[in-house]
């Protein structure tokens, strides 16, 4: 069964992008390739239990088991050794990606306190969008009573768009609530 967002992309969004940017075919229209969720747990160097909690929360949010990220090099100032676990990340593609994006747009982002839309300036110049979430409590899967520490996470939406303008149009059509 095709996700409603995926269906809307193929029936409405892709043709609209083709006409706006004058592509020759719908295959040229930018599409969302993957979504990467990253949660850095800097305190995991002192307390390994914090990393386990972050992994559990990311599993609940994304629906798949995260990869534990390790430090690339030692930094004495942070009491960090090379190879120490310092975070977790998940790469979502296909149906899970569309499910997550749908949930992010329609459920999670409206739950952010004092929400006035997301910044349209967070594109990287290559058509990818990065969104910082300050607290994991905005996701409906996270139980407020079971959380002992508020953690943020990064949401990176990787698109096949060549320019930020194309990516902005794609994400606006998908329904991302950009601030005016």
From Swiss-Prot:
Instruction: State the species of origin.
Output: Lacticaseibacillus paracasei (strain ATCC 334 / BCRC 17002 / CCUG 31169 / CIP 107868 / KCTC 3260 / NRRL B-441) (Lactobacillus paracasei)
Q: Name one Pfam family in it.
A: Ribosomal_L5
The protein depicted here goes by the name Large ribosomal subunit protein uL5
Alphabetized UniProt keyword annotations: Ribonucleoprotein, Ribosomal protein, RNA-binding, rRNA-binding, tRNA-binding
Q: List the disulfide bonds.
A: none
Instruction: Show the InterPro entries listed in the entry.
Output: Ribosomal_uL5, Ribosomal_uL5_bac-type, Ribosomal_uL5_C, Ribosomal_uL5_CS, Ribosomal_uL5_dom_sf, Ribosomal_uL5_N
Q: Quaternary arrangement and interactors, per the entry? A: Part of the 50S ribosomal subunit; part of the 5S rRNA/L5/L18/L25 subcomplex. Contacts the 5S rRNA and the P site tRNA. Forms a bridge to the 30S subunit in the 70S ribosome.
Task: State the Gene Ontology BP annotations.
Answer: translation
Q: Which family does it belong to?
A: Belongs to the universal ribosomal protein uL5 family.
One GO molecular-function annotation for this sequence? tRNA binding
The keyword DNA-binding is assigned to this record: no
Query: What role does this protein play?
Result: This is one of the proteins that bind and probably mediate the attachment of the 5S RNA into the large ribosomal subunit, where it forms part of the central protuberance. In the 70S ribosome it contacts protein S13 of the 30S subunit (bridge B1b), connecting the 2 subunits; this bridge is implicated in subunit movement. Contacts the P site tRNA; the 5S rRNA and some of its associated proteins might help stabilize positioning of ribosome-bound tRNAs.
| HAMAP family, sorted | Ribosomal_uL5_B
Please tell me one Gene Ontology term that the record gives under cellular component: ribosome
């Amino acid at each position: 069964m095709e996700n409603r967002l995926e269906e809307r992309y193929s029936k409405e969004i892709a043709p609209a992008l083709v006409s706006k940017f004058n592509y020759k075919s719908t295959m040229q229209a930018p599409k969302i390739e993957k979504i990467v969720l990253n949660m850095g747990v800097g305190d995991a160097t002192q307390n390994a239990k914090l990393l386990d909690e972050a992994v559990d929360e990311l599993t609940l949010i994304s629906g798949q088991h995260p990869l534990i990220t390790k430090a690339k090099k030692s930094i004495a100032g942070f009491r960090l050794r090379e190879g120490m676990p310092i975070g977790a990340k998940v790469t979502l593609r296909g149906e899970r990606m569309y499910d997550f994006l749908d949930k992010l747009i329609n459920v999670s982002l409206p739950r952010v306190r004092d929400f006035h839309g997301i910044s349209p300036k967070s594109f990287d110049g290559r058509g990818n969008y990065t969104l910082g979430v300050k607290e994991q409590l905005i996701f409906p899967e996270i139980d407020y009573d079971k959380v002992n520490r508020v953690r943020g996470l990064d949401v990176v939406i990787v698109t096949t768009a060549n320019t930020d303008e194309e990516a902005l149009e794609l994400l606006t059509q998908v329904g991302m609530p950009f601030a005016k």
